[in-house]
Amino acid sequence: MRLTFVILLVFLTILNVLPHLSQDLSPYDTGLYHQHIVEIIKQEGLIIGSANLHDRIGFNNSNFYLVAVLEKLIPFVPGHYLLNPIVYFGTIAYLISLIFYLPHYKIAYKIIALGVIISISLHPLFIVSISPDTIAYCLSIVFIFKILLKSPGKSLHFEFLLFAILITVKFSSIFLALMFVPFFLGRNRRIYFKKLSEYIFICLFVIAPWILSNYLISGFVVYPVLQLDFLSPEWKLPLSLAQSHMETIKSWALSQGLGNAKYTNVWQYFFNWYETYSVNNIHGSFYLISLYKLMLPFLFIYVLSFLLNANRYQKLFEFVFILFLINSLWFFSAPDPRFSYATLLIFPFTIFSYSITKLFNKKSVALSKTIILLLILFSMARICFIDFGFIDKMKAPKIQTEGNWVPTKYGFMTFEPKADQCWDVSIFCNPYKNRNLKLIDGDWKKIIEL
């Protein structure tokens, strides 16, 4: 029976993954700096001050190290067909296993899992790519479900490990720290506080090496977070550049360069965002906006039910409120859906699941079987979208980057691309054509700006 389930699990997961492999959804940033970073890691491991070539190298997303390792181990398969599809496969498999294995009294979580599977199957972000966004939202989905399903008093070691990894992949995942709050304020808080030192150690064990590499690459603890600026090595990026980058990230997330990024109050901020994402389908925005419009009446019912019977729904309400808070922090910091795709999807389905379980309260077994049937039918329908043309795409030649080798004032030969995308043409690609760079060659290569 167990073997049969494993075969079914793998089969359904494959049906949900295969349709995406023929779609190269690599974002523009892959050519801009993603592939450049991977090439640096493969050839040198790390170049001190390499962010002086391109400041976005300073983001130092840890997934690029994994991509580099996989490309070394499996050189005949392009990197964008390796890490992200594997992580996406694992996430879908995990959600499917929840639908099959969770007991009937946890039917609400099965509904949420089904909603998320359908959502990320129909509206994926960068599956065939090396973008950190994919692994960030996939691992965030797993993290949130592990938190929601955690039994009172049980250890949080794995969840803190996953959280620490997420921080190194995408620093915007820092908001997920709020998911731990109910554990440290609830009835079992003494149990969790006793193990707090262990949780902190796990986080430091993962994050400390990443912070060190951040420092060596850009001179910042976390680039471009200005609040963590207290180091000044000779290779450090200018503070003004970091400040400008933060402003660019927020304004671009608000308008995508298509709408108005200027605002004077909260309402104008909201309307600027809505004007951008309701007219342009950016990172699944059409789907998300429709989902939230549909959710509004259910949200009203949910809040009203909680007020009438707070004790019964306290645990679920705590996490619903935290998801709402995380989404609010996302909205007022950098409101591009790709920065918090997991919480943006899980929040409305949590509200929907409550309403559905209230309606079918006495038929949870039948509802559970219905959810499994819907999962199987949806997965089978995905067969129509499978295109094995991705096999030929995997054999396609590398993108040729046009440009010239030009020396800087200090004799440092860098490659200046005709456009601004470096891809993997050279580890010394210089898209900003900065002629003030100097290379100090030694056991560790170092790039400084004079």
Where in the sequence are the language-model features?
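Membrane-embedded helix bundles of polyisoprenyl
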Residues: L12-T13, Y88-L98, L102, K106-I147, ...
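Membrane-lumen/periplasm interface segments of specific transmembrane helices
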Residues: Q23, L66, L196-H283, F385
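Perimembrane helix-loop-helix junctions
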Residues: L176-L204, T350, I356-K358
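Start-transfer (signal-anchor) and selected internal transmembrane alpha helices
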Residues: M1-V17, I191-I202
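Intrinsically disordered, polar/acidic, low-complexity terminal segments
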Residues: L231-W267, F271, L367-L450
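Membrane-interface alpha helices of multi-pass inner-membrane proteins
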Residues: P124, L156-P182, I202-F205, G219, ...
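Hydrophobic, aromatic-rich transmembrane alpha-helices
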Residues: V87-P103, Q268-Y313
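Active-site lumenal/periplasmic loops and adjacent helix-entry segments of GT-C-fold
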Residues: N16-I107, I127-S129
